């Protein structure tokens, strides 16, 4: 990327100025709302905590004569003396600083994007590299098969309310407008910013009730509306122009980027997602898709004023208008008269009318009327083909490639359904439903008594049979009926919205091939699959979700067994010879640590690639990544480029969760940048990484070193996880028990029937708790032991070579380094000394020792004196953030201490205390830009 140091310096200066500006405005707001005393208290606490950090780190920059212990004692004494209302205002002030500085940072990122030359973007770089290294034909092949799918999930990691996020976005919009200091424009802008900050201060940042899945769907739609109408069409237009320079075309109806959603389809562990809820959310998505389409059509109507009095139009287009007018007798006669010689406007008016009718039909659950509404997205897109052909044939090719193509590509991406809905359910629920159906037949052996192999054989034979297990609708017992009902709901949804509304059914906790066949048999019962009739069909596909290390290691055997079954192989053929497999990053990390999880997932991708090739199918990998490194997070571009060779064939799916969505997609420019990154990485990986970047010898040597690292890291991690006192330590040293009160998401934080302990705790609250207490164990623990083991085995030179030559290894180490930089053992020690019983302190010593070892090993590997030396701007940013983050952590400890004292006394916890405690949780999340 061509980007000068001078530009970076200017941008950094602008960012610092913006942060100072909004901080000053926040201070003025605090004085307006509460008088000068609150602002004075904020500064007193900030300076004290800053001094304690400096003293703890050696005192080189300390400004006072006190030891770290003395300063911490002062902070504790001050905070313990604060009345509850004052403590609440104090923590809100620090939390609001992060909301405002985060907004300033987003504006800074947007400015950085705008300073780049037009030809210096990620897509321009990808197109140029592919055309230059592989040739235009390879580039065309990649474009033809490009299918990138970000999947929005409702995973509860966004701690901020939409009401707050909306105001933050509004503040970002105002801040982004350039004004000169001392001008009237700057004064007006400051007035606007001050007004927004006052509004934010008087807005409750905590949710009073837990959101429903429908609420979560509305939140996702909020972001999708902007992405699908602004960021994506413009980006695809630019991509089309870049490709044209190399003689490559982006087909007019192509949809290289499509969004999906789990919201309303993810049933695993969420009893609130019922068939009725799924139906309601699909209808909500359709209403928004129709509304967006109509708005886009209105834009085209205003543009396409081409007149037949000056230029002609294709007869096929004119004939279609005649047919439309016959089918739509209720159109406004005045519009028809005004546009009598403007066929494109007439056609678009008819398309708009049919879209309105489509929305009404779906809302009323009535039947499709051919010619009056649309049954499928392809039917709608075919109308644009008529418009395009006529424009090209009558000297308006630029219009066809411009305004028309922009709208056509947008509608091709979201269709009548807005986002494709994945359905996910736990494997055990399918076996329960199948078992009830089978046992009604009076078989010799009860279904529940069958081994996995026996179940696979039985289910394979059942899938091959045309005889259903039940010839008529029946009601099953318990949760089985709800499971069975979902498949019937999918069939109805496909009939109502078309084949793109639901494409994939995900089986979580897949441990064997029989788990996938059980879901397929239920789909067959619901009429979604018919493999051997005169018109065979498979209306949905099935994706095993591999979540634990054991499942990842068995991945090749599971998929090989599946594809070896003739009936299932026929099902995959009917789905275009694509087998989707989802890889779960969160649970494998929680179970085995970050290094082993990442390595096992990397190896799994290689194995799945080879199994798919053996059976003549393509594997589409679905990466279930969270926002934090402890749940597979990290830069998207690096993650995609770090995949093994031959894995990418233009197709990929990945989850976008919680706070990641607001961070990546809240501003149109940021949304575009993230979409560009994803598309560019998939294009480059598909075209230029078909063969290994390293030799056979290198790959073998690197793999051997990784096994050494992984084994040692895993052993060290399990030493901590298997410690019988860890659950007590985790609950004592973190605010994880307060997570449920935050009302972040509709899904419970523990798996149903999971009992006590950490085993049933989901990965999100697991990472959440460690992050809040600044220990962030899931993002690095064990890595130091792993690297040390490799070094002591004589692999130091190999490690340095791997950093230089192997994208995967370099990406993992980079993510671990970032997490270590956000980890703070001084603050974590304050949590432990204040909240954790003495007999559990040994666990903190174990964590701190591994932290120090990991930092030392990372610095040895990178050649840095300190973490992030190679990224000084980021390093400085985190140091500045600590000045405002540390006070929130100290306040959290104090408030958590008060909460627990009230719990021990048996009294009811003061609602104001609980509220203040939860605000600290929001504040730490905003400060670290991570929850779980």
Curated annotation (Swiss-Prot):
Keywords, in A-Z order: Carbon dioxide fixation, Lyase, Magnesium
What GO CC terms are in its UniProt record? Answer: cytosol
| Record field: catalytic activity | oxaloacetate + phosphate = phosphoenolpyruvate + hydrogencarbonate
Q: Does the keyword Magnesium apply?
A: yes
The protein's enzyme class: lyase
Under Enzyme Commission nomenclature, its number is 4.1.1.31
KW DNA repair (keyword) present:
no
User: Which Gene3D superfamilies does the record match to this protein?
Assistant: Phosphoenolpyruvate/pyruvate domain (1.20.1440.90)
Which residues are connected by disulfide bridges in this protein? none
Sorted alphabetically, which InterPro entries does this protein's record hold?
Answer: PEP_COase (IPR021135), PEP_COase_bac/pln-type (IPR022805), PEP_COase_Lys_AS (IPR018129), Pyrv/PenolPyrv_kinase-like_dom (IPR015813)
Active site (catalytic residues): 155, 590
Q: Which Pfam families match?
A: PEPcase
For this protein, what is any one GO molecular function term? magnesium ion binding
Cofactor(s) listed in the protein's UniProt record: Mg(2+)
GO terms (BP aspect): carbon fixation; oxaloacetate metabolic process; tricarboxylic acid cycle
- Protein purpose: Forms oxaloacetate, a four-carbon dicarboxylic acid source for the tricarboxylic acid cycle.
Q: Which family does it belong to?
A: Belongs to the PEPCase type 1 family.
- What name does UniProt use for this protein? Phosphoenolpyruvate carboxylase
From which source organism is this entry?
A: Paenarthrobacter aurescens (strain TC1)
Q: State the organism's lineage.
A: Bacteria, Bacillati, Actinomycetota, Actinomycetes, Micrococcales
């Amino acid at each position: 990327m061509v980007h000068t140091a001078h530009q970076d310096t200017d941008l950094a200066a602008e960012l610092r100025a913006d942060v100072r500006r909004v901080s000053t405005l926040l201070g003025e707001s605090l004085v307006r709302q509460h008088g000068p005393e609150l602002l004075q208290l904020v500064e007193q606490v900030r300076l004290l905590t800053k001094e304690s950090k400096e003293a703890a780190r050696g005192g080189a920059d300390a400004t006072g004569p006190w030891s770290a212990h003395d300063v911490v004692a002062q902070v504790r004494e001050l905070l313990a003396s604060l009345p509850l209302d004052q403590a609440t205002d104090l923590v809100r002030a620090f939390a609001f600083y992060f909301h405002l500085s985060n907004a300033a940072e987003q504006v800074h990122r947007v400015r950085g994007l705008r300073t780049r030359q037009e030809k210096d973007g990620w897509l321009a770089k990808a197109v140029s590299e592919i055309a230059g290294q592989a040739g235009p034909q390879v580039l065309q092949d990649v474009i033809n098969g490009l299918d990138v799918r970000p999947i929005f999930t409702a995973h509860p990691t966004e701690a901020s309310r939409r009401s707050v996020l909306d105001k933050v976005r509004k503040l970002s919009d105002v801040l982004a407008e350039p004004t000169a200091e001392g001008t009237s424009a700057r004064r007006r802008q400051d007035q606007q910013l001050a007004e927004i900050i006052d509004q934010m201060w008087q807005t409750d940042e905590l949710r009073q009730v837990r959101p429903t899945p429908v609420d979560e769907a509305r939140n996702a739609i909020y972001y999708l509306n902007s992405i699908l109408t602004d960021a994506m069409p413009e980006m695809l237009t630019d991509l089309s122009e870049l490709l044209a320079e190399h003689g490559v075309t982006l087909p007019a109806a192509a949809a290289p980027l499509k969004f999906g959603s789990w919201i309303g389809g993810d049933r695993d562990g969420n009893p609130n997602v019922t068939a009725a809820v799924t139906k309601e959310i699909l209808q909500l998505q359709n209403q928004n898709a129709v509304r967006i389409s109509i708005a886009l059509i209105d834009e085209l109507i205003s543009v396409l004023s081409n007149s037949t009095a000056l230029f002609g139009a294709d007869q096929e287009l004119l004939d279609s208008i005649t047919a439309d007018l016959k089918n739509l007798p209720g159109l406004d006669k005045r519009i028809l008269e005004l546009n009598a010689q403007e066929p494109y406007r007439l056609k678009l008016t008819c398309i708009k009318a049919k879209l309105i009718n489509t929305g009404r039909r779906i809302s009323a659950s009535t039947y499709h009327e051919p010619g009056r509404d649309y049954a499928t997205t392809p039917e709608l897109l075919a109308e644009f083909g008529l418009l395009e052909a006529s424009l090209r044939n009558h000297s308006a090719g630029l219009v066809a490639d411009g305004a028309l193509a922009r709208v056509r590509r947008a509608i091709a991406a979201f269709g009548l359904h807005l986002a494709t809905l994945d359905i996910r359910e736990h494997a055990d629920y399918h076996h329960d439903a199948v078992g009830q159906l089978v046992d009604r037949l009076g078989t010799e052996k009860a279904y529940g008594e069958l081994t996995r192999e026996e179940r696979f054989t039985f289910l394979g034979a059942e899938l091959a049979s045309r005889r259903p297990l039940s010839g008529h609708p029946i009601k099953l017992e318990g949760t089985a009926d709800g499971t069975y009902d979902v498949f019937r709901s999918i069939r109805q949804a496909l009939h109502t919205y078309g084949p793109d509304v639901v494409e994939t059914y995900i089986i979580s906790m897949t441990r064997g091939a029989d788990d996938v066949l059980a879901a397929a048999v239920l789909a067959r019962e619901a009429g979604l699959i018919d493999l051997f009739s005169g018109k065979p069909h498979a209306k949905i596909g099935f994706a095993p979700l591999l979540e634990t290390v054991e499942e990842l290691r068995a991945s090749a055997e599971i998929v090989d067994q599946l594809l070896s079954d003739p009936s299932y192989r026929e099902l995959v053929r009917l789905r275009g010879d694509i087998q989707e497999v989802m890889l779960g990053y969160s649970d494998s990390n929680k179970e085995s640590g970050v290094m082993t999880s990442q390595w096992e997932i990397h190896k799994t991708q290689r194995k799945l690639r080879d199994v798919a090739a053996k059976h003549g199918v393509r594997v589409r990998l679905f990466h279930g990544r969270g926002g934090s490194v402890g749940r597979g997070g990290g830069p998207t571009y690096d993650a995609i480029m770090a995949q093994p060779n031959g894995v990418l064939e233009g197709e990929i799916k990945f989850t976008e969760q919680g706070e990641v969505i607001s961070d990546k997609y809240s501003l149109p420019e940021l949304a575009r940048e993230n979409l560009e990154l994803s598309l560019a990485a998939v294009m480059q990986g598909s075209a230029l990484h078909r063969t290994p970047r390293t030799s056979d010898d290198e790959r073998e040597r690197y793999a051997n070193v990784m096994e050494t690292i992984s084994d040692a890291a895993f052993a060290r991690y399990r030493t901590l996880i298997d410690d019988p006192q860890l659950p007590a330590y985790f609950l004592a040293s973190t605010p994880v028990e307060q997570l449920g009160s935050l009302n972040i998401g509709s899904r419970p934080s523990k798996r149903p029937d999971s009992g006590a302990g950490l085993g049933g705790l989901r990965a999100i609250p697991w990472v959440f708790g460690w992050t809040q207490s600044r220990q962030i164990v899931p993002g690095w623990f064990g890595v130091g032991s792993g690297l040390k083991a490799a070094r002591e085995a004589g692999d130091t030179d190999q490690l340095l070579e791997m950093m230089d030559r192997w994208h995967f290894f370099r990406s993992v180490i980079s993510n671990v380094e970032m997490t270590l930089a956000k980890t703070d053992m001084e603050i974590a020690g304050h949590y432990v000394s204040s909240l954790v019983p003495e007999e559990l302190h040994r666990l903190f010593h174990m964590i701190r020792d591994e932290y120090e070892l990991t930092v030392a090993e990372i610095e040895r590997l990178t050649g840095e004196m300190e973490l992030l030396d190679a990224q000084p701007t980021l390093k400085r940013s985190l140091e500045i953030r600590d000045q405002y983050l540390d006070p929130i952590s100290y306040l959290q400890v104090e408030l958590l201490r008060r909460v627990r004292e009230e719990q021990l006394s048996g009294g009811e916890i003061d609602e104001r205390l609980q509220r203040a405690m939860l605000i600290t949780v929001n504040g730490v999340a905003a400060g670290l830009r991570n929850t779980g």
